[in-house]
C-alpha cells in the first residue's frame, strides 16, 4: 500500500452517491440504479482510502477485488465484505457485471447494544468477507429493501430507531 491513505468522510460519500443519509451515522446505496461509471470512478482511485465509518459491500453479481489492510480479498457473488472504520482499503478491480449494495455506518450506531455487538465486530475483524448462505439470501434481500425504504421515508421521525431495529 502507498504511504498515506486518503481519508473520506461519510458526507463525501453521501454527496457523491446522491443518496439519503441518516445524520452522519448511516447511508445505503447501490451501483446498479445509477450508472456504473458513477460508482466506478469513485471506487477505483489508484490509491488506498480510509472511511470514517464501517463499509459493508453486499455483492449480488460479479466480483470485486480489493486490498483491505495488507490482505487481498475478492468479494464474489453472494458474499459480503465489512471494512472496519478507519481501515485502509483499495479497490483494484470490478467485474463488468459487478452489482452491489453498499452501506456506510458509524460504530456509534451500535452504542446501546452492549457487548454482543462488540463480539460480532471482533469476529468480523478476523473474517471480513463472508458468504450469504443460500438459506438466508431471501431474508437478506428483504432486510436490504426495508433499510432502503426506511431511508427514503424522510417524514418518519422514528427512522433512526427503525434502522437500528433492522440492523440488530
Give the location of each predicted region.
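Short beta-strand His + acidic residue motifs that chelate non-heme Fe in jelly-roll/DSBH
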Residues: 65-67, 83, 89-95
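Short acidic-glycine-tyrosine-enriched beta hairpin
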Residues: 70-82
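Generic protein-terminus/edge-of-domain signal
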Residues: 1-64, 73
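Residues immediately flanking
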Residues: 61, 85-87, 105-107
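A short, compositionally biased micro-patch
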Residues: 59-61, 76, 84, 94
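All-alpha amphipathic helical-bundle segments outside canonical DNA-binding/catalytic cores
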Residues: 153-166
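Tight coil/turn sites that cap or link beta-strands
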Residues: 42, 77-78, 86
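A hydrophobic/aromatic-rich effector-binding and dimerization subdomain
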Residues: 2-3, 16-19, 91-153
